[in-house]
Amino acid sequence: MASKKITYPPPPIITITRPLIAVDWGTTSLRAALILNAKVQEERSSDQGIMSVAPGDFPNVLSQICSQWLDFEDVLILIGGMAGSAQGWQLAPYCPCPVSVHYLANHLHWINPHKIGIVPGLSIEHEHAPDVIRGEEVQVLGALSMLGKNSARLVLPGTHSKWVEVREGVFEDFSTYMTGEFFSILKDHSILSKTLSTSSPLEFNAEAFDKGLDLRLKSKPDRKNTKLEGTGNNQARTANTMRKPNLLHDIFGIRTLALFDRHNPEYLVDVLSGLVIGYELQTQSFRKNEEIIVVGTSALQTYYSHALERLGACPITLGSEATWRGFQVIAQTIDHGIA
């Protein structure tokens, strides 16, 4: 099921007087873009995430991926993501929420004053534990700018999915779910790995995904009205199909579906996807037709959009272009001296 097409007015024009090099430096990968006159001229990528860069070698890696771009006069380099973590180039302390783009731009960690800056992450205090974001804040700023919004609810699915609420241009709340990492562990490193396909599905299987999703969305049974069907050992409680969902039990069900040859290994990968995403989404509440901005890869957009529509929400999808737009928003804020 495709996400709904909604027409928005053209996004606000970005005005930046300086050449901009935007760098999205993750744990295992590195992406960079040259932006001139608010347009992406060229993109480059490598597998030199922060975990593969030796201490003190970050300047060399940056020079390698940017090469001729550094020759532009008065070029501004903005770096987001894990380069600002304790394991990265230099620590860029978290900014505690609530945070505006102006506050964020005013608290860049400058490696070279007004030449090379690292965008700080965000932190928030929840009742049970603090939560943090590094890198997604740039994507959020870009998504809002592209859609001409200053208030929105967003989900950024990935290894660690982020749910973010922005009101009047201020990051008010966010929460993190280890959905992608949990899925990967179950698929590749648990007992399920013996029965699931080792490769990713070639295409989205909505039927399989819905089967996993429904395991979480089923309602709690009315025990008083439970009836027994069948006779002897074949008796079954009809309410079992409406039992209270339990993650640990449902995960094992993926294995037994394979043991009894109910579905093939490829099918069960999408069942598992639906299951873990369903548990993530059940922590959220949605108004009918509420717009939820989904920022992520094409594959993750498909999974989350389908699930959100099942729950009555209206997903709006954006990809990697939101990252580069977010860096431009920060650069414009710096450029205009309104940080």
Language-model region placement:
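A short acidic Gly-Thr/Ser loop motif
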Residues: 23-29, 155-160, 179, 296-299
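Short glycine-aspartate micro-motif
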Residues: 20-24, 76-78, 152-156, 293-294
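Short beta-strand-loop/turn "lid" adjacent to the catalytic site in phosphate-handling enzymes
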Residues: 69-133, 168
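Glycine-rich phosphate-binding loops at beta-strand->alpha-helix junctions
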Residues: 29, 289-307
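Glycine-rich phosphate-binding loop plus the immediately following alpha-helix
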Residues: 123-218
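Active-site rim beta-loop-alpha module in soluble metabolic enzymes
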Residues: 177, 185-223, 227, 232-273
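Short glycine-rich, Thr/Ser-proximal phosphate-binding strand/loop in the N-terminal lobe
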Residues: 20-57
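Glycine-rich phosphate-binding/hydrolytic loop that grips phosphoryl groups
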Residues: 275, 316-339
